[in-house]
Amino acid sequence: MVRKVKRRVSCLPKATYYKPREIPLCDLEIINLSVEELEAIRLCDLLQIAQDEAADQMGISRKTFWNDLQKARQKVADALVNGKAIQISGGDYVNSGVCKVEFLCQKCNHLWETPCNEKRPENCPKCGSESIYRKGGDGRGKRHTERGFCCPKHGDRAVGDQEESV
């Protein structure tokens, strides 16, 4: 019997439960979305990464990635259309922790990345300026930047079209 490959997941969700408003939890059917199914949606739909690249990031075949993505989309659609709660839990995954955040120095235009789980840098590593900004439009998808946050773990504001200090 073939042993299931653990999928690599970059960012764990901050919220793990979603339910329709104004419907008591006791009246709701709950759909379980695994962490790796959520990661497939995040990579393909939110970050708009090609499926073959997303499969490589998760350490699985394209077919397995496609199957996970289809299952996840079906579960989310079922919950939204039929008013069900979504619980994100379980799965067979390894936290790879490769979520990155890009920063841009306003003084020297130096661009660099930091891991998501590290403290926000205080100054530019190249020139030492404190005029640094979280760079928007970093491949995380338009909706992601419009929401204004890079990710739940980092919690830093993104700079999209308008220049906002972080």
UniProtKB/Swiss-Prot annotation:
PANTHER family: PTHR37478, UPF0251 PROTEIN TK0562 (PTHR37478:SF2). InterPro entries: UPF0251 (IPR002852), WH-like_DNA-bd_sf (IPR036388). It holds the Pfam family DUF134. Coiled coil: none annotated. Belongs to the UPF0251 family. This is UPF0251 protein UNCMA_27150. It comes from Methanocella arvoryzae (strain DSM 22066 / NBRC 105507 / MRE50).
